[in-house]
Structures are given as C-alpha cells and as structure tokens.
Design a protein with these regions (language model features):
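Conserved beta-propeller blade repeats
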Residues: 3, 32-54, 79-98, 105, ...
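Edge strands and adjacent loops of beta-rich recognition modules
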Residues: 322-330, 335
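Short, conserved, GDST-rich strand-edge loop motifs in beta-rich repeat architectures
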Residues: 112-119, 200-207, 248-264, 271-324
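Long hydrophobic segments that form regular secondary structure
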Residues: 49-56, 61-67, 191, 213, ...
Length: 393
C-alpha cells in the first residue's frame, strides 16, 4: 500500500547547529480584485408585464425584473450563457426566455413559487424550468398565448411553432420555407383571440424583402400575404382589438436599393370592412358612433338582466362569464378587397424605431430620427396632427 508524505515547512541544518526555517515566497501574476458593477443603461431588450407593474429586461446576458414604480430589482438568471427573448404570462408570475447553454438555444420558464409573493422583484423563491430540452434543436423567441395556455417560439431560426404547456405537445405553424436567414428569428405576434399569428415572411422567394403575413394558429394552413410589396415590410403587431395589423414599410421612403439607407413609414391593414369604415370616420361622426354603441350596449345589458333569474351569486357568476366572453371576441377576417383597406399613418418617411397604437386606437406613438438620434413622436389619428412628445437626443 502506497503512502504520501506532505511537507508543510522546509528547514536547513548545519552540523552542530539548530535547524533554520527557510522563508519561501511565491510570486504570482497580478489579477484584478472582484468588482461589484452597477449599470443604469445598456439593456438589450425589455418587456412589460400584462398588469403594467413589472419590467423584465436583459443586461449583460442576464435576466432581471424590476418594479415599474420602485427601484426593487431581482436578478433571475446567474449563468455564463447569454439569455434573450422575454415574455410574461398573463398571470404576471411566469416569465419565458431563451438561453444559449451548452452551445444551444433552449427555452426556459421562471416561476414565482410562493403564492404570498406578489411579483418577481419581491419574490423569495423563483424556480427555473427547462422547456422541451434538446441538444440538437434550437428554440428561441418565446411568446405566451393570450390565455397563457400555450407558448409560441421559433425553432431552428426559421419555423414558427407552438407548444401546449400542459401536454407539452408541439405543433408546427410554418415549415421554414418562408424564411431564409439563419442569423436570428423573425417578428411575429399572437392575435388577441389567440387564433391567428401575424408575422414577417419572405413571399415568392424574394429574399431578403419581407412581407407581412397572417396565418392560423392551429397550423397546417398557408400564410396569407397581406402586403405583396416589393420592398421591406416588418415589425407586425395587432392593433384596434385585433381588427387591424400595424407594421413598418420602406415602400414610400428612400429604398434600400444598395442595401442601406432606407426609410420607413407606419401603416395599418384592416382585417375587416367595419374596422376600416370606423377608422375613416371624421372625429364628429366617430364620437356620435361611440355614443350610439354605448346606448345599444346599455340597453342590451338591461334586457339581459331582465331575462335572467336566480340568486345574486348566480347572477354574479354569469356576469363574470359574460365579461370574460366579451373580452375574448373573435376576430373577423375578410380577405376580399383587403388591399384597399391599407392606409399610411405617418405623414413622412424617417429612420423609424418602434411603433405602437394606443388601446383606444386614437394615438400613434413612434420613435423616429431625422437629425441626430431617435425622438418620441405622437400622432392623433383622427386629427392627423403630429407633434414631438419627447426629445431623446
């Protein structure tokens, strides 16, 4: 059996003298002290929770969630890998993101464990779950469905997929033949009723000029080309309670004929004639229509209440069910003459950033750069009045 001898100190000794301890010094290369870094900018992406009380963002490849009203912030991930793509579940207590661990992008869910914890910034325990782990398939850019029961994502950078979070069953929405770039994903969005996706895609193999499409969320359906443009269109999102799709396009501004220097405009394509007719009303006619609709809704509520009998508890349950049903109104899609229901919103083309329409459909907000950096602009869609809301640069 072998043995080991460990020597702690070294000594020298001459004849007739006492042992002398040898002083040993080891010189090592300098290394910096551990530093605590504080950042107030540099986030690469961010998203707001459905209740508007939390903001999730990514800084230096890590996921953080902060309170919208206070400085309380919690770091969700602690990994050497990069994270990207953030999506809150409708319950505000689950966060989806992608992480490039072990050299492969995969989906993860972070969940607040304790029911007593109101949000992520104040949560004491946050659990992380790997969703559909795989060593060969890449999955990224997650987005929760409006009801929170499903999660959409982009697989292998080209295919739009959906997973049922209860059964873990995955279905294919697009087959990857309409997107050629493998440098990242593409923009897409759920419809408010959860039955459709709008997305940017390459139609007629006209890469890299993308169009705006509409496709069923059930899968096994072709993409409907809404724009049919020879120029770049992108950043689609649903607006006006899902009755229209807002997007950016370079068809009116300077075009990227030499692969640079293009300018964008914000546009709306209306999915049905009623939504388009409402948009085209003057401010006076629109106010009259709103009053008429309010009176009709009030009368309908009275008739419904008269026709229902039962206890207060039953009535309350029925009212809650009716409210939920009203909030999830199915979107009417009318393909005929859709090309005539497309309008340019912005008065002039620009180097444009993010674009969004207010929930009531009255105001357009967008970032645009004319001279220098981006500024925040506001446009009244009824009055066609545009003004600078905030000077950023």
């Amino acid at each position: 059996v072998g043995s080991e001898m460990c020597i702690r100190d070294r000594y020298t000794q001459q004849d007739g003298a006492a042992p002398q301890k040898v002083q040993i010094e080891i010189i090592r290369d300098d290394r910096p002290d551990t530093a605590r870094l504080t950042f107030t900018n540099g986030a690469t992406s961010a998203t707001v929770s459905p209740d508007g009380k939390q903001v999730a963002f990514i800084a230096r490849g890590e996921v953080f969630v902060t309170s919208a009203d206070y400085a309380t912030t919690k770091q969700i991930t602690h990994t050497p890998a990069g994270e990207s793509g953030l999506s809150f579940a409708p319950d505000n207590r689950t966060l989806a993101y992608a992480s490039e661990r072990n050299g492969n992008w995969q989906l993860y869910l972070a969940k607040i464990v304790r029911k007593e914890d109101p949000n992520f910034p104040n949560a004491t325990i946050v659990e992380e779950e790997a969703l559909l782990p795989s060593a060969t398939v890449e999955r990224a850019f997650p987005q929760f469905s409006p009801d929170g029961k499903e999660l959409a994502f982009i697989e292998d950078r080209t295919r739009l997929m959906v997973v049922n979070l209860d059964t873990k069953k995955v279905r294919q929405i697009t087959d990857g033949s309409t997107w050629y770039s493998t440098s990242g994903g593409f923009d897409y969005a759920w419809s408010p009723d959860g039955k459709w996706f709008t997305l940017e895609f390459i139609g007629n193999r006209h890469d890299p000029y993308s169009d705006i499409g509409l496709v069923s969320a059930q899968g096994n359906s072709p993409i409907i080309n809404l724009t049919n443009s020879g120029y770049m269109s992108g950043s689609p999102r649903f607006a006006l309670d899902g009755n229209a799709i807002l997007f950016k396009t370079e068809r009116y501004g300077m075009r990227a004929h030499a692969s640079w220097g293009s300018q964008d405009d914000a546009m709306l394509v209306f999915l049905n004639q009623d939504a388009y007719d409402k948009y085209c009303l003057s401010k006076e006619d629109y106010e009259l229509r709103k009053e008429l609709e309010a009176e009709q809704k009030k009368a309908q509520s009275k008739d419904t209440a008269k026709g229902k009998k039962g206890s207060k508890k039953d009535a309350g349950q029925e009212k809650a069910a009716d409210d939920d049903k009203a909030q999830v109104k199915d979107i009417t899609v009318e393909l005929k003459n859709m090309e005539d229901r497309m309008v340019r919103l912005t008065p002039n083309s620009s180097d444009m950033g993010s674009v969004i329409i207010s929930k009531d459909g009255e105001t357009l907000y967008y970032f645009a750069a004319f001279e220098g950096g981006y500024d925040l602009w506001k446009m009244d869609l009824r009055k066609k009045d545009t003004r600078l809301l905030h000077k950023m640069d």
